[in-house]
UniProtKB/Swiss-Prot annotation:
GO terms for cellular component: axon; extracellular region; extracellular space; plasma membrane; side of membrane. GO terms for biological process: neuron projection extension. Residues 1-35 form the signal peptide. The keyword Cell membrane applies. This is Neuritin-like protein. It comes from Homo sapiens. One of its GO terms (molecular function) is identical protein binding. Keywords: Cell membrane, Glycoprotein, GPI-anchor, Lipoprotein, Membrane, Signal. Belongs to the neuritin family. It is a lipid-anchor; GPI-anchor. Residues 140-165 form a propeptide. Transmembrane segments: none annotated.
Protein backbone atom coordinates (compact mmCIF):
# COMPACT_ATOMS: atom_id res chain seq x y z
CA UNK A 1 0.00 0.00 0.00
CA UNK A 2 1.28 3.43 -0.87
CA UNK A 3 1.62 5.92 1.89
CA UNK A 4 1.20 9.59 1.34
CA UNK A 5 3.39 12.22 2.87
CA UNK A 6 2.27 14.17 5.85
CA UNK A 7 1.74 17.41 3.94
CA UNK A 8 -0.58 15.73 1.43
CA UNK A 9 0.32 18.30 -1.27
CA UNK A 10 2.39 15.84 -3.26
CA UNK A 11 -0.52 13.42 -3.46
CA UNK A 12 -2.48 15.89 -5.55
CA UNK A 13 0.26 16.55 -8.12
CA UNK A 14 0.53 14.41 -11.25
CA UNK A 15 3.60 12.23 -11.74
CA UNK A 16 6.60 13.97 -13.31
CA UNK A 17 6.22 12.08 -16.60
CA UNK A 18 2.69 13.42 -17.13
CA UNK A 19 3.47 17.09 -16.51
CA UNK A 20 4.52 17.86 -20.13
CA UNK A 21 1.23 16.38 -21.35
CA UNK A 22 -0.63 18.99 -19.35
CA UNK A 23 0.98 21.67 -21.53
CA UNK A 24 -0.28 20.06 -24.74
CA UNK A 25 -3.62 21.92 -24.77
CA UNK A 26 -1.76 25.21 -24.50
CA UNK A 27 0.32 24.31 -27.55
CA UNK A 28 -2.60 23.06 -29.64
CA UNK A 29 -5.07 25.78 -28.74
CA UNK A 30 -3.80 28.63 -30.99
CA UNK A 31 -3.79 26.61 -34.26
CA UNK A 32 -7.20 25.15 -33.47
CA UNK A 33 -8.59 28.58 -32.68
CA UNK A 34 -7.22 29.94 -35.95
CA UNK A 35 -8.77 27.08 -37.89
CA UNK A 36 -12.10 27.53 -36.15
CA UNK A 37 -12.12 31.27 -36.86
CA UNK A 38 -13.16 30.59 -40.43
CA UNK A 39 -11.66 30.80 -43.89
CA UNK A 40 -9.10 33.46 -44.64
CA UNK A 41 -8.44 35.25 -47.91
CA UNK A 42 -6.01 32.59 -49.05
CA UNK A 43 -8.63 29.85 -48.96
CA UNK A 44 -10.31 31.35 -52.04
CA UNK A 45 -7.17 31.99 -54.09
CA UNK A 46 -8.02 29.45 -56.81
CA UNK A 47 -11.64 30.56 -57.04
CA UNK A 48 -10.59 34.20 -57.38
CA UNK A 49 -7.97 33.39 -60.00
CA UNK A 50 -10.49 31.32 -61.96
CA UNK A 51 -12.96 34.23 -61.92
CA UNK A 52 -10.23 36.48 -63.32
CA UNK A 53 -9.58 33.96 -66.11
CA UNK A 54 -13.27 33.69 -66.94
CA UNK A 55 -13.52 37.49 -67.19
CA UNK A 56 -10.45 37.49 -69.44
CA UNK A 57 -11.99 34.87 -71.71
CA UNK A 58 -15.32 36.70 -71.86
CA UNK A 59 -13.72 40.03 -72.72
CA UNK A 60 -11.40 38.47 -75.31
CA UNK A 61 -14.41 36.97 -77.06
CA UNK A 62 -16.01 40.40 -77.53
CA UNK A 63 -13.43 41.98 -79.78
CA UNK A 64 -10.40 41.07 -81.80
CA UNK A 65 -8.58 44.40 -82.03
CA UNK A 66 -5.19 44.59 -80.39
CA UNK A 67 -6.20 47.50 -78.16
CA UNK A 68 -9.24 45.61 -76.85
CA UNK A 69 -7.22 42.45 -76.28
CA UNK A 70 -4.51 44.34 -74.40
CA UNK A 71 -7.08 46.15 -72.28
CA UNK A 72 -8.55 42.75 -71.36
CA UNK A 73 -5.07 41.44 -70.56
CA UNK A 74 -4.33 44.43 -68.32
CA UNK A 75 -7.67 43.98 -66.54
CA UNK A 76 -6.82 40.32 -65.95
CA UNK A 77 -3.40 41.26 -64.60
CA UNK A 78 -4.97 43.74 -62.16
CA UNK A 79 -7.63 41.21 -61.09
CA UNK A 80 -5.13 38.41 -60.49
CA UNK A 81 -2.77 40.72 -58.62
CA UNK A 82 -5.60 41.78 -56.32
CA UNK A 83 -6.62 38.16 -55.66
CA UNK A 84 -3.07 37.14 -54.82
CA UNK A 85 -1.92 40.26 -52.97
CA UNK A 86 -2.89 39.04 -49.49
CA UNK A 87 -1.38 35.57 -49.85
CA UNK A 88 2.30 35.88 -50.76
CA UNK A 89 3.30 32.34 -49.78
CA UNK A 90 0.37 30.65 -51.50
CA UNK A 91 0.75 32.90 -54.54
CA UNK A 92 4.44 32.03 -54.81
CA UNK A 93 3.62 28.33 -54.81
CA UNK A 94 0.91 28.77 -57.45
CA UNK A 95 3.14 30.88 -59.68
CA UNK A 96 6.07 28.50 -59.37
CA UNK A 97 3.98 25.53 -60.48
CA UNK A 98 2.52 27.50 -63.38
CA UNK A 99 5.95 28.77 -64.42
CA UNK A 100 7.20 25.20 -64.61
CA UNK A 101 4.33 24.41 -66.97
CA UNK A 102 5.10 27.52 -69.04
CA UNK A 103 8.75 26.49 -69.39
CA UNK A 104 7.70 23.11 -70.74
CA UNK A 105 5.51 24.63 -73.47
CA UNK A 106 6.78 28.10 -74.43
CA UNK A 107 4.73 30.21 -76.83
CA UNK A 108 6.55 32.80 -78.98
CA UNK A 109 3.46 34.96 -79.66
CA UNK A 110 1.88 35.54 -76.30
CA UNK A 111 -0.12 38.30 -74.69
CA UNK A 112 2.85 39.49 -72.68
CA UNK A 113 4.80 40.11 -75.87
CA UNK A 114 1.86 41.70 -77.67
CA UNK A 115 0.66 43.86 -74.78
CA UNK A 116 3.91 44.47 -72.92
CA UNK A 117 4.44 47.85 -74.59
CA UNK A 118 2.07 50.50 -75.89
CA UNK A 119 0.93 50.09 -79.47
CA UNK A 120 1.77 52.87 -81.90
CA UNK A 121 0.13 53.10 -85.30
CA UNK A 122 2.48 54.44 -87.94
CA UNK A 123 1.12 55.68 -91.23
CA UNK A 124 3.20 54.65 -94.27
CA UNK A 125 1.09 56.18 -96.98
CA UNK A 126 1.88 59.61 -98.32
CA UNK A 127 -1.61 60.62 -99.33
CA UNK A 128 -4.59 61.48 -97.18
CA UNK A 129 -6.17 58.10 -97.85
CA UNK A 130 -4.75 54.94 -96.36
CA UNK A 131 -5.82 51.37 -96.37
CA UNK A 132 -5.29 48.51 -93.98
CA UNK A 133 -1.97 47.56 -95.57
CA UNK A 134 -0.46 50.99 -94.92
CA UNK A 135 -1.11 50.88 -91.19
CA UNK A 136 1.13 48.74 -89.05
CA UNK A 137 1.11 48.36 -85.29
CA UNK A 138 4.59 48.51 -83.83
CA UNK A 139 5.92 48.15 -80.34
CA UNK A 140 9.44 48.76 -79.08
CA UNK A 141 11.57 45.64 -78.71
CA UNK A 142 11.30 44.11 -75.27
CA UNK A 143 14.48 43.32 -73.38
CA UNK A 144 15.43 39.66 -73.16
CA UNK A 145 14.42 39.31 -69.53
CA UNK A 146 12.21 36.66 -67.99
CA UNK A 147 8.53 37.52 -67.94
CA UNK A 148 7.12 38.56 -64.58
CA UNK A 149 5.76 35.60 -62.66
CA UNK A 150 2.15 36.72 -62.93
CA UNK A 151 2.23 36.93 -66.70
CA UNK A 152 4.11 33.68 -67.14
CA UNK A 153 1.70 31.89 -64.85
CA UNK A 154 -1.32 33.29 -66.64
CA UNK A 155 0.04 32.14 -69.97
CA UNK A 156 0.73 28.69 -68.59
CA UNK A 157 -2.75 28.45 -67.13
CA UNK A 158 -4.30 29.65 -70.37
CA UNK A 159 -2.29 27.02 -72.22
CA UNK A 160 -3.46 24.32 -69.82
CA UNK A 161 -7.10 25.37 -70.17
CA UNK A 162 -6.93 25.60 -73.97
CA UNK A 163 -8.32 22.10 -74.65
CA UNK A 164 -11.38 22.91 -72.53
CA UNK A 165 -12.50 25.71 -74.85
Amino acid sequence: MMRCCRRRCCCRQPPHALRPLLLLPLVLLPPLAAAAAGPNRCDTIYQGFAECLIRLGDSMGRGGELETICRSWNDFHACASQVLSGCPEEAAAVWESLQQEARQAPRPNNLHTLCGAPVHVRERGTGSETNQETLRATAPALPMAPAPPLLAAALALAYLLRPLA
